[in-house]
Amino acid sequence: MKVFLGARGRTIGALALTSFGSGMAEALFLVVISRAAFAVTDDVDQIRVIGDRSLSLGGAILIGLSMIAIRCGLALWAAAQSSRFSTSVVADTRRTLAEAFLFASWPVQQSDRSGQLQELLTTFTNQGSQLVNSVTLGVSSTFSLIALLGMAVAVNPVGSLVVLAAALAFGSLLRPLRSAVRRRGTTAANAGMHFASSLTSLSQLGQEMHIFRIQKQATSAVDELVTSSADAERRLLFARSIVVPLYSTLAYLALIGALAGITISNATNVAALGAVMLIMLRALSYGQAIQNAHSSVAGSLPFVERLQVELDRYRAGRQYDGQQPVGHVGDLTLNDVSFSYEDERRVLHEVSLTIHHKEVVGIVGPSGGGKSTLVQLMLGLRDPSAGSILAAGRPIIEMSRDEWARKVTFVPQEAHLVAGTVADNIRLFRDDVSMEAIERAARLAHLSDDIASFPEGYDRPVGELGGHLSGGQQQRLCLARALVERPELLILDEPTSSLDVRSEHLIRQTLVELSKHMTIVIVAHRMSTLDICDRIMVIQEGRLKGFDTPSQLSESNAFYSEALTLSGLK
């Protein structure tokens, strides 16, 4: 539970002391008032509070009023502290989890299931909030109960100890039920994560559902997910809900046992017995709260444990950040670079090559051949399993990741936009990027004329799915985003694969203009995209099968030659 409670022992301790003080005030009030009631019945002016200490009836009433005021004040303070404690813990946990994820390496992030982060930040964190509330309630109730029991023992030791012993004995009978609550909590946590990831996957098929008319089948799949998750939640809630009724039944049996014990011991102090029974009945409510808190913690703990595991995984997966400045990127060299995923599946085998400064290089090859992995290595998203990658003769793994990200940028095949304006999407949270730099990047990407035609200009709102922009405009916006910090190496993945003729022409024009100022690497399946390349490399089965000029490669490499033929370019 360290992710939620951590080093907050001082706050919990303050709540415990406050609850103990509140419990003592309540216990003393119950003793004084119960004995005052017996004094009125017996028509006496003096009452015994604890031991031989006596008070007048009026004094007892004043003490009772004082105890009410003290208890109310302490309870209000505890409520304020508890609510502040709970909300701050949840907020801090969400910040910590989000930061750990965002700074985790790309391989760690990519290994997450769809919707996992959202589920951790919502359902799992809310369960953590419930756990924190349960812990604070349990601590408060426990110390209030201790205060009440202490007062009861001081008033009538025999009856109080009998009740306490019976309550502990009966309470131990609930241990198997609490274990069942925890097991069902684990099942519910796993079901919730599966529901979130599966639903996220389905939600991404919106267009396909309409195209293939599979709404009924998708609805059935969602229904199965809902039913499975609901069943797990129902079993957990049932196990939680029966803890308190069972405890109450056992506690009442303990009170009956106490009466029997007092009768056997021939206790004759009726006033003391009445005070003890009143305290014990009040203590029963605290006992119920403790049992309720315990079962709630048992149900929420699996969620919190899973959240802690993921948080530790994100932190452990934080990518190493070199300290050396990048300086000039220059030539990019790969020396015997190999890469294997965690399942030991090798996707690149001893790739060696050099991409010269201001050279335009194409990458082609069959799907699954290793092109995407090679690009991720160049971007610094992954580190080679063997070999090295050098920029201007220096290992990029030793360089600052932040500076490398400004010098080496990427345009993905699919545009990813955020809710905001056109300017917001070009800037993309980089607060140091000026409006002048944004306008310059838009001109380089041949997007400025389109923006000028918008009534709102750069303030035109753009949805996360690209609303208000065509596909070509979205792609050019992503190109402007990549150019806004004046990179030295630009990598593009299928930049024109799904564009109209005009947008494709504009992007090709941009690349021709940029080739005079920076190194460009283009991953492409469409051979027409590569006619601006100085050299082209062929990646097949994780190996570099060819790296030469287009004319030489068409004669020496069978894959490239066949691709040109199939494209009608040869």
Regions from the PLM with identified roles:
Residues F4, S82, L102-A147, Q204:
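Juxtamembrane loop-to-helix connectors within ABC transporter transmembrane domains
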